């Protein structure tokens, strides 16, 4: 949402300072970004020349943002994601425009608590750990590498820092992509092929249809359920923390084969996800327990 909100409808100057994506950057250079969405851990950005940018950040990939960044306020709820070819969802999240020196976002599909904050000081904090633009592991390592440069740069366009696979630039916003597992261009058919390989995402599309797909995918496999939940073809984008928590909350042994897990438990897990994941997006944390109280630890 943040890339769509910041760059949507704007003509992009694309380059590959590292050189590994030079041909791809040249093909989208000068195009307008028309849409952007994520399924699981993969991002798909559409351009007006018919090409799609597909990015999978993996473990170490990250986006560094510079200049004017438009974040999304999720405090009132999480909007539905509409896939290509589907009718647009009626709900939406308000955009909150911010201007800051820099920031980071990593791990597509994850959001930070400061998405609902309203001042630059809250967005870019002292160490970046809770910044709306410092999202995804390993945050502290990345922040430690570039804190000085990111915090003090006034040059425009920003100086290239480190290894940048792709830079997307407008007259007021810049995003640098570093270390992704996948960065490629696709046509419409290519996007469909990738989406067809992915399991349902609890944050994307019709939850009821996703539930049926998940139950079917998990129930036919003899693989341990704990392993199945990390298979992106079974369910997209859950991740290790939610996997462990959901299994614990459902009282399911992670070593139990998928085809031995009662259907009622599979459905219980899916419905739990469809509640927990939007909560996590809304508050900017992986929250699996309500009502936690106590003094803040510093």
Residue ranges and their predicted role:
Residues 1-298:
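Structured catalytic/nucleic-acid-binding cores of DNA maintenance enzymes
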